Amino acid sequence: KITALLDSIEPKGECNFVQDFAQQLPIYTLSEILGIPEADRQKLVTWMEFLELAQYIQVEQMKKELDAEHTKEPVNTEMIDMFNNMIDEMFEYGRDILNSKRKNPQDDLLSAIANAEIDGQQLSQEFLDGSWLLIIFAGNDTTRNTLSGAIKLLTENPDQRQKLIDNPDLMPNFVQECIRMISPVMHMRRTTTCETQVGDQLMGPGEKIVMWYGAANRDPSVFTNPDKFDIERENAEKHL
């Protein structure tokens, strides 16, 4: 697949790397592992892009609702309806294909999930829904973002690009340094269930906690000159 993608790009002379490569490769790989029919793979692209935009759509919608409270104007629910319809479509497809894999298992990940058992019981629909959502969302954007970010880093740092060309053995460390610099996952959020103390910070129950990967991955107490892209960095793999 990599060769095919590169062959399709070469005659163009230039390309949109995100659209022509970084987006295509993870979808193909994920679909092959899951057992998604080729005809349905574009649906995954649409759902993933929509899920990524959904959080921003929700924020804008909340702003409009707050404004409407002051202006007494009716709230436009078109965006909310579109979001709900897209979510329903995504979960309906997931349930259908998992049900199909349960009846006719194949050598793929969805078949394994659909037919897995805990204490002799098949997984609940709620568990299957959660697995489906996690797989199609988390299995794509991190790889796409890392591929795109790596090309950007190499473009901005020609000296590091030349080092990699001259010494391909640096590739594993190059990948680790790219992940550190890019931090393809922005943050992880949690909600406290009871009073909790982390370091000097006391948090009450129900408080929101956010861990920013990018901040940790550029911690100067861990990484010397943390904003520098260095494919020979000795502790590049210490990223989160």
Predicted segment positions?
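Cytochrome P450
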Residues: 1-240
